Amino acid sequence: MYILFFLIIIFLILFKLNWYYTNFEYYGLIIKNSHIPDFTRWILSDKFIAKEYAKLNGFDVPKTYQLVKFPHQIKFNYKNFVLKPTDLCDSAGVYLIKDNKNTLTNKVVDKQKIIQELQNLRSSIKTEYYMHEYMYNGLIPFSGYIVEELLLDENNNIPCDLKCYVFGGKLHYIAKTYNRRIINGEQKFDSIWLDRNWEPIKTKMIKKGYVYQEIKKPINYQKIVMLVENMGKILRRHCRIDIYVINDKIYLGEFTFFCGARIHTFICNYKLGKIWLDNPDDYHYEDKRLKKLVPNFYNIPN
């Protein structure tokens, strides 16, 4: 009898945990919602389309130098540039080149080595690099590469990025990410999270690299809030809007609908999940301007 009672308790606990991680916890909601067909999230996961759409909505964006299908088509004739796949996330295949050196490794650009690395990455892609392929039977807008302007701050350094978590058209959290570096082949970074009033969050929000501190608010912070919240209202979906602030200009980094929430702490994903459930997405709405931005060589779902 005691064994049966114990097994029932274990079953109920596991059932509740499974429900929580599937229907409430932030990362579970990301996975669950990634299977819902939605052209808006699907097409804006493409870095080129995201830039073009951001321009329509008041953001500055880096200049695009090239948009190509294959790595061997990339021209390495720029001193400073960013090279990245149009479709991948999680920093996969991203190269920040400054003065002909990779800023993360501090090594001189080796064209053939980069081409080979991109080809190897493309042949070993798994779901950690994107989730939007779940929506339309594995279809991706464009599996190519974009070469664009390298943004530098007033000190000629790579700027910190601000990851703005927007739900229901309202900014709830900002994660400032900085001090990116490579240690033993693994990318590391530091981060501090802030609320909408730019107050730092004492509770640890990511598992590694969380640094609680008071930081200076950007001079144009109210403009930042207005811009990202307006974007959230237009999207009518939860989105992490990544931006850079340089000389009072607000540049879009990317729209992130499927972020790497596995690096978040339990309490962080609990908070984000609750906010999301309180502010549900509207997957029926689509901005008619989006399809007009798509080049004719891109894929479009039927």
Give short role names for the model-derived ranges.
Residues 19-24, 245-302:
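C-terminal active-site "lid" helix and adjoining low-complexity regulatory extension at the edge
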